[in-house]
Amino acid sequence: MSDKSILASILCSAMILGSLGASVHAQTPSSCKGTHAGAKGAPLFSPPLASVVTGTRRVQFYSAPNLHCPINGVFVVPKDELVTYAQTRDGWSSVMYANPTTGNNVSGWVRSARLKQAGTVGPKQ
């Protein structure tokens, strides 16, 4: 099974759980309910940035900008394209990944060091 099919399966499972009301965040520690994109510590980019995953290994998604808050089984792989909405000063980015095959998407936080800016999303001003 290819990395993209595994990711598609994981994203599909996450979407099904979300639609059934089973929040991915339901059993996370209270520290995982911290900073959200647009908060003082993570100002929004306007327009959002287009980013590409770099490196050779997969990048874990987190429910909050905290290493103790992984979203189990949700990750992206090198060369995947993300929309980056915000970034903290301590190296976290609020992102969304849209699977080009299924159209499913997932949002969360990833380590900024693994992203390369590829432009902006939206109209040029």
What is each stretch, according to the model?
Residues 28, 37, 73-113:
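SH3/SH3-like beta-barrel superfamily modules
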Residues 71, 105, 118-120:
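Short acidic, gly/pro-rich beta-turn/loop elements at beta-sheet edges
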Residues 13-16, 50, 103:
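N-terminal start and proteolytic maturation junction detector
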Residues 15-24:
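C-terminal segment of classical bacterial N-terminal signal peptides
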Residues 1-11:
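Bacterial N-terminal signal peptides that target proteins for export
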Residues 26-75, 85:
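N-terminal secretory signal peptides
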Residues 110-125:
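Short, low-complexity, Pro/Ser/Thr/Gly-rich segments in the mature regions of secreted, periplasmic
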